[in-house]
Swiss-Prot record:
It catalyses: dTTP + H2O = dTMP + diphosphate + H(+); UTP + H2O = UMP + diphosphate + H(+). SUPFAM superfamilies: ITPase-like. Pfam families: Maf (PF02545). It is found in: Cytoplasm. The keyword Hydrolase applies. Nucleoside triphosphate pyrophosphatase that hydrolyzes dTTP and UTP. May have a dual role in cell division arrest and in preventing the incorporation of modified nucleotides into cellular nucleic acids. It is an enzyme of class 3 (hydrolase). One of its GO terms (biological process) is nucleotide metabolic process. This is dTTP/UTP pyrophosphatase. Its EC number is 3.6.1.9.
Length: 192
């Protein structure tokens, strides 16, 4: 199998690939995650994922398959990572008792040929009504501070999620089903 590189600093993306016992390296991209909020959310995550993969491709000196990804939460606009504890409170109150979308853009880029596949996955997440006391306890853990939407479905915030429609791993940050399909169909790489 060709060298596989994950262009991400996300511990969640790393863990998802490690759980599959896939051999890969990590090279963190230097891309600033700035975007035009007027663009469609799917376009934003696809573009950022591409820029991350391209940045890493331009910095390595041997052939590799590079995976780039970017995840955002959408409810009446884009919800990023909280800037501070008050922002986390506001975000969690916005998501409480309602549905929102989690969109992850993925890019797989072959540095030897330049062949690139760009796609995205959308998952709907239904949150229960979260009390202010629950929000305060959750924020006190520190868990929401580095996550889009101010929550981690794989962590303590699982108690807030009533149901999802779509790929669970997409909400975590790497839609492994779609990634597996892309790697198999376009790059002849099996994750099993």
């Amino acid at each position: 199998m060709e060298r596989l590189i994950l262009a991400s600093n996300s511990p969640r993306r790393k863990e998802i690939l490690q759980n599959l016992h896939v051999k890969f390296d990590i090279i963190v991209s230097d891309v600033d995650e700035v975007f035009n909020e007027k663009d469609h959310p799917a376009k934003i995550v696809e573009t950022l994922a591409y820029l991350k993969a391209e940045d890493v491709a331009n910095r390595i000196d041997r052939d590799a398959i590079i995976i780039g990804a970017d995840t955002i939460v959408v409810k009446n606009g884009i919800i990023g990572k909280p800037k501070n504890k008050q922002d986390a409170r506001d975000i969690l109150r916005t998501l409480s008792g309602d549905v929102h979308e989690v969109i992850t853009g993925i890019v797989v880029l072959d540095t030897s040929s330049g062949y690139t596949v760009i796609d995205h996955v959308v998952t709907e997440v239904y949150m229960k009504k979260i009390t202010d006391e629950e929000i305060e306890r959750y924020i006190a853990t520190g868990e929401p501070m580095d996550k889009a939407g101010a929550y981690g479905i794989q962590g303590r915030a699982a108690v807030f999620v009533e149901k999802i429609v779509g790929d669970y791993y997409n909400v975590v940050g790497l839609p492994i089903c779609k990634l597996g399909e892309v790697l198999h169909k376009h790059f002849h790489i099996n994750l099993l």
